[in-house]
Amino acid sequence: MFDAFVVALTSVWADSGFAELTGGHVIMMLVGIVLLYLAIGKGFEPLLLSPIAFGCILANIPKNGFEEPGVMSVIMYGIHNEVFPPLIFLGVGAMTDFGPLLANPKTLLLGAAAQAGVFVALLGAMMMGFTVQEAAAIGIIGGADGPTSIYLAAKMAPQLLGAIAVAAYSYMSLVPLIQPPIMKLFTTEADRKIVMQQLRPVSHFEKVVFPIMCTIVISLLLPSVTALIGMLMLGNLFKEAGCLDRLSDTAQNALMNTVTIMLATGTGLTMSAESFLNYQTILIIILGLIAFIGGTAAGVIFGKLMCMVDGGQTNPLIGSAGVSAVPMAARVSQIVGQKANPANFLLMHAMGPNVAGVIGTAVAAGTMLAMIGPVAK
């Protein structure tokens, strides 16, 4: 009887995850716990980092059976086949007001300038030995746009998706810490004190026509990014039409929350010890930081140039909002500007380049897809 009991215990042990648990699995579970602490305890992008972190823990439990048909396989299908990022863009579009951009169209140039960091990191990654597709996927981290980073990584470097997504969302959450020193480095006290004129009112007609025309023009130029731009602008059309409130509300809330859970959890599920614990992950984190710093600096420098051209009417601080971390980057511009001049209110002005950055990052991704092409699956 004792022998039968021992055999039963041995069988239970052999079938358990403990039997195949490795040091790598333990390390990645600890990484997941640290990310949960940062998300819940410190408030770093909790809506995104929490499910990413929990997915990371789940991915590193041996014999989890996730490769079998079921809900987890559906989630992974949505990640690897670019289903979730466009749906996220639908929700983002429904929550985005392009009014500040339409009221001051030249801020579109600031959103474009902030994409310079993407291409700087791309070149740096290639110099470090990454393939051109991997380098492109790493570079897009500089746009501070998680869904676009995941979309491009799934197409060009699926093996790096977990590291790229974590880097992108981490730097998005660290915008208030990373950007202010760079903004102050490239501006003077006088620059930061500049008060900008109030934006003109934007008509309902302009707000309705913009997403339609933007979709047509960008999609014809870069067909590979039609899914992202099309869904972004469809969501915005829901918001601005005035007769689609139910669709707008669903896109902003129920759909956005559901897809966020699935996208973030699926991203965490890609963070297995085998794919994450290597020197490439460290390089990706470093290159992502370089890309983000480069994008912020390029936006501020272009803002300073714009200030010189228009006779001091543009506060260069709004250039840092050209990265597409909406609305965190615009808030940082407001905070830094108000510290220099308490009468300064830059938030709405900074929202122009901020929403332009969302478009700019998608365009940068489409440009790289058109020039380089996706990796063969």
Which residues make up each language-model segment?
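Transmembrane helical segments that form the transport core of multi-pass membrane transport proteins
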Residues: 215-302
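Alpha-helical membrane segments and immediately flanking helix-loop junctions
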Residues: 77, 81-82, 89-95, 110-120, ...
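Entry/N-cap segments of selected transmembrane alpha helices
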Residues: 33, 101-122, 273-299, 350-354
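Interfacial helix-loop-helix linkers and transmembrane-helix boundary segments
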Residues: 40-49, 67-75, 95-110, 244-252, ...
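Hydrophobic transmembrane alpha-helices of secondary-active transporters
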Residues: 35, 58, 78-102, 235-238, ...
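N-terminal alpha-helical transmembrane segments of multi-pass membrane transport
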Residues: 1-70
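Membrane-embedded hairpin module used as a gating/binding unit in multi-pass transport
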Residues: 167-243
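Alpha-helical transmembrane segments
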Residues: 159-177, 287-295, 318-321
